Amino acid sequence: YDQPGLALLETFQYFIGNTDWSALAGPDGEQCCHNVVPYARTDGSLVGVPYDFDGAGLVNAPHALPDERLGLRTVRQRLYRGPCRSTEELQAALARFAAVRPQLTALFTDNPRLEARRKNAARSYVDEFFGVLDDPARVTSAFRRNCAP
């Protein structure tokens, strides 16, 4: 995998609160991957494209339940499921989100198809993510506490 792209994918999954994915391992009987499709670029590097977000906290689907092995009470609880990244890799991925913060927020607040209750819930969830990004101690806690060595 292209490592900056993979770090961005991992951070995106944390942003939306999705724990139902793996860019490296598939479910029993499948070699790779789970809710991520690896695509080859023209230079031969792989980029992962995530899909199937019904288990994400941002979506908050009524039928969604957290994986009991993860110790989460609801799908709205975020858990970083990626590897331990260097400070530089992590900061680069987080900077991509910070750079488009107004646009990400507007996706929900300016969407006429969402009812007010869903807009407010989505806005709150997005704001929680940026609250983590705005606090270096919370970044360390969120992205270092459960990362895979």
Predicted features and spans:
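Conserved kinase catalytic-core segment
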Residues: Y1-P62
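Short secondary-structure boundary/capping segments
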Residues: A64-P66
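Middle-to-C-terminal accessory/interaction subdomains
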Residues: L70, T74-P149
